[in-house]
Amino acid sequence: MATPANQTGRITQVIGAVVDVQFEGHLPAILNAIETKNGDNRLVLEVAQHLGESTVRTIAMDTTEGLVRGQEVTDTGNPIMVPVGVGTLGRIMNVIGEPVDEQGPVANEGLRPIHAEAPTYTDQSTEAEILVTGIKVVDLLAPYAKGGKIGLFGGAGVGKTVLIQELINNVAKAHGGYSVFAGVGERTREGNDLYHEFIESGVNKKGGGEGSKCALVYGQMNEPPGARARVALSGLTVAEHFRDQGQDVLFFVDNIFRFTQAGSEVSALLGRIPSAVGYQPTLATDMGALQERITTTHKGSITSVQAIYVPADDLTDPAPATSFAHLDATTVLNRAISEKGIYPAVDPLDSTSRMLSPLIVGEEHYQTARMVQQVLQKYKSLQDIIAILGMDELSEEDKLAVARARKIERFLSQPFFVAEIFTGSPGKFVDLADTIKGFRAICEGKYDHLPEAAFYMVGAIEEAVEKGKKLAAEAA
């Protein structure tokens, strides 16, 4: 809600990221941005509470060191406004829309408030269409919906960020679509690496502009909780503008857990009583306000991929558990799989998607996915017997199932474009038809004669056959 702008108030109290401001006249509305100078920097405060008749409690979007009591503050009359449009592509902005990549001001098509209503039911589109990513394990077993929400679950260091980079790269190449990346409370080093990798891989041009495909909005680990709690909304606002222009946008959030974590810090600073495991009492409301805006309308779509850190690998923790309710597909990364050297370390039995239905993906795709899961599940149930008694005690049928399962496990790995510099093997984009054909053939036993090493880190099944011949020649 807009209020009369340019009213001035004075700071009465500063406690960390919380600043109390006293106004003589009309109080600024909740969620309004109010501004002050802190040294040479413009400091934005967001109104969070009204205390009594003349004081508001605000959350700072930057550090508050250097603020003094009695300092003058101006009400902008609006929520935080960020630049939107093609000019944001290839640029890095912070939570309040200021460029932080030292490439000059951001050319924009106007400013939009970061707080907005979700699209109404009549505006939303309900068509079900699959988004092909070129990553075999994803496309086959847990396909992504165009305009859907996807959760990437995994503990620390199992490859969430690399998978996100590969998705941005593949979607930019295959679909030519724009992406928006919101870095929420993650490592500054990773943010910097991502920016440079995008330039090196041709996703973005240095300094932005023509040829760039991805806008970056960062609020990193070292920022105050106010910035981390709002930066996802700033990124979403940029994505919403592209959607309203008729684009199919990809919106990446790394990491949605830090959004919850920052909300919990802000909540504690505002003196609210915590709920389960010390999280904010408004956890579900905060999550809903963000997630309900990520949707497909009749104009365009926002497909969102959210990395979700799982504290102590516990999926029942309130933060990941609240995210689950909003998702169309889950891609679960498993440490046990990454320890085998299989990347992407996606768990083929734990990952789910509402798109995996014969009515949406077709009968052949559905049956192949189920066959693959059946073989892998059988292998999983035999693992105890193998560990205790060894392979020799299995029946011939079970031995065959285990051999096929191990081939499938290895065939679910594939070299990534963004990891070429580390692995030395060129990345592979595998078409959906090739993926289905390859896995179906393995399940039907057409490649029982090939060694399992032939299936490791290849693209389509033809490459596995070539690799098998090469291995046989070397062995001879």
UniProtKB/Swiss-Prot annotation:
Annotated ATP binding sites: G154, G155, A156, G157, V158, G159, K160, T161
Function, as annotated: Produces ATP from ADP in the presence of a proton gradient across the membrane. The catalytic sites are hosted primarily by the beta subunits.
UniProt keyword annotations, A-Z: ATP synthesis, ATP-binding, Cell inner membrane, Cell membrane, CF(1), Hydrogen ion transport, Ion transport, Membrane, Nucleotide-binding, Translocase, Transport
Quaternary structure annotation from Swiss-Prot or TrEMBL: F-type ATPases have 2 components, CF(1) - the catalytic core - and CF(0) - the membrane proton channel. CF(1) has five subunits: alpha(3), beta(3), gamma(1), delta(1), epsilon(1). CF(0) has four main subunits: a(1), b(1), b'(1) and c(9-12).
Family: Belongs to the ATPase alpha/beta chains family.
Translocase recorded as keyword: yes
One Gene Ontology cellular component: proton-transporting ATP synthase complex
Membrane-traversing stretches: none
Residues making up the signal peptide according to the UniProt record: none
Chemical reaction(s) catalysed: ATP + H2O + 4 H(+)(in) = ADP + phosphate + 5 H(+)(out)
Membrane topology classification: Peripheral membrane protein
Compartments where found: Cell inner membrane
Origin species: Rhodopseudomonas palustris (strain HaA2)
Broad enzyme group: translocase
Protein name, entry field: ATP synthase subunit beta
GO MF, any single term: ATP hydrolysis activity
UniProt key word Cell cycle: no
Enzyme Commission number: 7.1.2.2
Family matches, as PROSITE patterns: ATPASE_ALPHA_BETA (PS00152)
Pfam families: ATP-synt_ab, ATP-synt_ab_N, ATP-synt_VA_C
